[in-house]
Amino acid sequence: MVSEAPKYSGPRGGGLMCTLTVVTRNDTYIMAMNRDEKIARGTGFPPEIHEFEGAQAIYPSDGDGGTWFATNEYGIALALLNWNTVAPHVIDIKTRSRGRVIPALIDSRSLSDLHAVFDASNFKEMMPFRLVGVFPSEQKIWEWRWDSKQLGFQAHEWESRHWFSSSLSDDRAESARGAVCRTAWHESDAGSLSWLRILHASHAGDPGPFSLCVHRDDVKTLSYSEVVVTPGLIQMGHFRGSPCTMAQIQQIHSIEIERADRTELAVSVGSAAI
């Protein structure tokens, strides 16, 4: 159980309609993300193991070779959020998919590896995004922000945290979902995996655009993904569909790999630049 209420990263950053939660414990953690998207986009494909030069990785696919959520054998996890509160520079044509960002970075073996790839990367012609990275060996959480012209970053403490966003209103999403989460942290099993699943399936305040499990006419939570990192194992669970139906259907797709030993790392840079 996590004793302290987590931090919130809502309207300060904006982003894709989603809820992202990280629950930290020493050099382990659990992490969950609701992917809220236009229904016409479809649920995508379940996680698979991907072999890179630097590391094994697990992630679901959006159907076009991209992803929004991934982890690797070193326990690093990345989550991508569209940054909708920042207006892209209209003089540029945005033709490159943000879904390609994580696959280009996820074989990084450390925070310094990932920094090196970022420094060599070119995000030109990509719409604004935020990338949240969790690094258990370093006990650090980082957030990179691309506004379509410049890349910035923010370092967070190693503590439990939520991110809320909505294309309708980041402020209202943070207010409504944040209130639900603050209440949930008083529950006896707060911080557990079962608690996290129930939280991300919540309709507290009635199903709608600002409930954690989103329901709108043309947009809803299309899938739920989770990562569990322990000293010896990396596990990703994934459910295609609204999280509110998980309890009835009980079809969470789960896949796991062994956690690599950081003491055996060679000096190397993780990925090729984007």
Region spans (language model):
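Intrinsically disordered, low-complexity polyampholyte segments enriched for Lys and acidic residues
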Residues: 4-7
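N-terminal nucleophile
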Residues: 13-274
